[in-house]
Amino acid sequence: MAKPRGRKGGRKPSLTPPKNKRAAQLRASQNAFRKRKLERLEELEKKEAQLTVTNDQIHILKKENELLHFMLRSLLTERNMPSDERNISKACCEEKPPTCNTLDGSVVLSSTYNSLEIQQCYVFFKQLLSVCVGKNCTVPSPLNSFDRSFYPIGCTNLSNDIPGYSFLNDAMSEIHTFGDFNGELDSTFLEFSGTEIKEPNNFITENTNAIETAAASMVIRQGFHPRQYYTVDAFGGDVLLSAMDIWSFMKVHPKVNTFDLEILGTELKKSATCSNFDILISLKHFIKVFSSKL
């Protein structure tokens, strides 16, 4: 029994001349049908390849968007804190900083803050500080406003890193990026109780809708202001994030102890800029570098 006709296998077209006019017409019709079938198949394969590429690009954009929203919500939560409750320090670049220990290549760390997290933070930020050429990136101690001792940016978090209430009580609580990138972060955040937080030391003072409303007003064009913690590069169409916020994001990652923070900081320095307030890093470059280390 002959095999069915198809792209692979089956009978090959006959090379013998047709015996009559009817046979010639039938053979021409079969050849035309076979040609149209192959052309249609090639067209569908090209469309499938294009759809695959498009889906991959959409998947990458979704990951970038999830990471951006995660950082943005964390950033806005901190912005809503009263100034006397901010235990996460912010950096400022000063042309002539006061006489003190500075982060200009050699940092004097107080033994009070000598912990594994601080050492990791120092290793990471030591590579980034060179972008502020001719300036010293300094951070005053939050313990005492008159204490002018300095330590790496955001290395000391007196509130045990994360408050006991979640500001990710929506779809963002199931972020899965870079191969279950944040899968274990869900256990870090407790479910939001839905009741008003009355404790004076709690960070979260507004609900998710208020945070989203504030987010719309925070995007600015090229430039930076001390009250705004990230900016948009008007030329490259990229988002620039504070190095402090990137560190706050990385230090709670379950694999933080497996990262080579010195190499990570060195690679991120390639896209870092100094805004006279903080060190800013390209979001796209951070995603590319960070995902390659997982």
UniProtKB/Swiss-Prot annotation:
The keyword Ribosomal protein does not apply. GO terms for molecular function: DNA binding; DNA-binding transcription activator activity, RNA polymerase II-specific; RNA polymerase II cis-regulatory region sequence-specific DNA binding; transcription cis-regulatory region binding. Residues 22-72 form the bZIP domain. Residues 44-72 are annotated as: Leucine-zipper. Changing S282A: Impairs largely arsenic-induced phosphorylation, shows strong sensitivity to arsenic treatment and a strong, although not complete, reduction in arsenite-induced expression of ARR2 and ARR3. Changing S141A: Impairs largely arsenic-induced phosphorylation, shows strong sensitivity to arsenic treatment and a strong, although not complete, reduction in arsenite-induced expression of ARR2 and ARR3. InterPro entries: AP-1-like, bZIP_sf, Yap1_redox_dom_sf. Transcriptional activity is controlled by regulated degradation by the ubiquitin-proteasome pathway in absence of arsenic. Arsenic-exposure results in stabilization and increased transcriptional activity. Its main location: cytoplasm. Phosphorylation by HOG1 promotes nuclear localization in the presence of arsenic. Homodimer. This is Arsenical-resistance protein ARR1. It comes from Saccharomyces cerevisiae (strain ATCC 204508 / S288c) (Baker's yeast). The lineage of its organism: Eukaryota, Fungi, Dikarya, Ascomycota, Saccharomycotina. The gene is ARR1.
